[in-house]
Amino acid sequence: MKIGANYTPSQGWFHSWLDLDIDATRRDFEGIAQLGLDHVRLFPLWPLLQPNRGLVRPRALDDVVSVVRAAGEFDLEVTVDALNGHLSSYDFLPSWVITWHTSNLFTDPLVKAGQTDLISQLATRLREEPNATGMTVGNEFPQYAALAPGHHHPTRSECTVDDAQTWLETMLGTMRDQWPDGRFWFGFDDDLWFVDDHPFTPRHAVTQGSATTVHSWVFAQVGPRFGEGHPALTWFPRYLLELARAWSHDPERPLWLQEVGAPRTHVPDSSSAAFMTTTMASLTSTPGLEAITWWCSHDVSRDLLDFPELEYSLGLFTKDGKPKPEALALSDMLPDLHNAQPQHQLDEPLEFSANWDTGAGRSVCSPMGDLFAQWVDQAEQTGRAPRLALRPTPGLTDREALASARAH
């Protein structure tokens, strides 16, 4: 199993792409490598890469390549998110899709042409770098279609389930065309698993891309429901992975825990190391789990204003590069994590019912529901993660779904 970090630059956060200091980047990567981590996930900003639909800036692409090569100096593999998009509550959208040029990010043909142009040029550059392994479409890009109460995007791009499918196939297909040997992913927040009418569905998650990604955050629902210190917080990432396995018709489908972190809203400093070790211990036996990527590498500086409070302290390192207790705990666990072996789950699964095609009914899996509470109780009683199983529902047959999954 690979263990890495989502790279948040210690100097200037993602605004550092404006005037890249490659020496500062090297210092960050040196610290990450000294912990024993083996990969980083990078987030160049879409408006800087492509300020006009017809202009993908060569200098901006050069900067991405420079950072990839700097990571390679410390034997770190790299994946790159293309359309960023959305990061830590802030949207980074180019001027040609907002305000007077407001356009639908998922259905407008001109916008999609611009997106594929950027992805194509970025993939063409990255495929030449030996430590670059692949690309994610963008960080939690489906949040631009979010419509759940409290999560409804203020300038939402409406789309249907079929529109979402077409958009994903177009973006991922462009990556494959330009980088045949690369690996490609679709990253999303957990609304996809829990919101019945979200146009991006679990079916998309488990059939699109090289592996199913999971983003595990306890600050939204699990923490508020169960409270600080409850076992549900450290079991939640495993629950999401089991949910991903339940939706997939392909038993060989790989999994990537692309984001998991310790928000201080529900994990105080005094518990951060224990949260790390307990969370990781729950993950080691997960069938198909090939990588875990902690969010994030470095704390956000307090000099940067107006972030949600929890965003300032999610790093493995302080902004000055000092490893925090959870970083040291992770480093100590690396031999066990690298050698982790999946365990067969022989117990009867906990079943739920939802529609394979549309995702309708998926809200039964929400952390606010009975299924999750029952799953956590059973995990605590047995010390093992229970399986989940999706009951047969109207939609594709198992044979058709498996063929679709393997085709993508």
Task: Please give the residue ranges for each predicted region.
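Short, well-ordered coil/turn segments that N-cap beta-strands
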Residues: 1-3, 36-38, 72-78, 128-133, ...
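Short, acidic/polar
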Residues: 17-33, 115-123, 192-205, 272-282
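Aromatic-lined substrate-binding rim segments of carbohydrate-active enzymes
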Residues: 22-97, 157-186
